[in-house]
Amino acid sequence: MRWLIWTAVSTLVMLLAMTEVSASIRTPEISTKGSTSATAFRARSLSSEYNSLEKRSLRDKSSSLITESEERSIAESLANKVVNRLFKTLYKKEMTPLTFRAKMMGRDNFLVGDYKVWWDKARATGTIPKWKFQRSKSYT
């Protein structure tokens, strides 16, 4: 019940934050003299696919990056941090790629293969390497 109320209140706050009010009380003089209040305020774009004015760049004045690639880079940096922390933890617990694969119950996902490459590099050099997200060919 608390979760439902919390969701309803947060949704209401979010919707109220995204709206603009031109006037709370309208007088008949304003509405009869060709009021432009309906067209004076632009609607805010609520999704990244619809941009009312132009494409916006979060980090740069030039618009060389599109909005989708900026949003993807946030996910990539979070994935880099999470996977690097996971690999370091596994390495400190002295878990080999075979034991990691056994813990994953034999599933051969990308983490098992990448951990093997990362683990081999860490064993060969003696330093902890950084794992970097590599975009699959379907995205490029």
UniProtKB/Swiss-Prot annotation:
Signal peptide: 1-24
Protein name, UniProt field: RxLR effector protein CRE2
Domain statement: The RxLR-dEER motif acts to carry the protein into the host cell cytoplasm through binding to cell surface phosphatidylinositol-3-phosphate.
Known function: Effector that is involved in host plant infection. Contributes to virulence during the early infection stage, by inhibiting plant defense responses induced by both PAMP-triggered immunity (PTI) and effector-triggered immunity (ETI).
Signal listed as a keyword: yes
Subcellular location: Secreted; Host cell
Source species of the chain: Phytophthora infestans (strain T30-4) (Potato late blight agent)
Motif residue range(s): RxLR-dEER: 56-72
Family note: Belongs to the RxLR effector family.
Alphabetic keyword roster: Secreted, Signal, Virulence
Induction or repression: Expression is induced during host plant infection.
One of the record's GO cellular component terms: extracellular region
Coiled coil among keywords: no
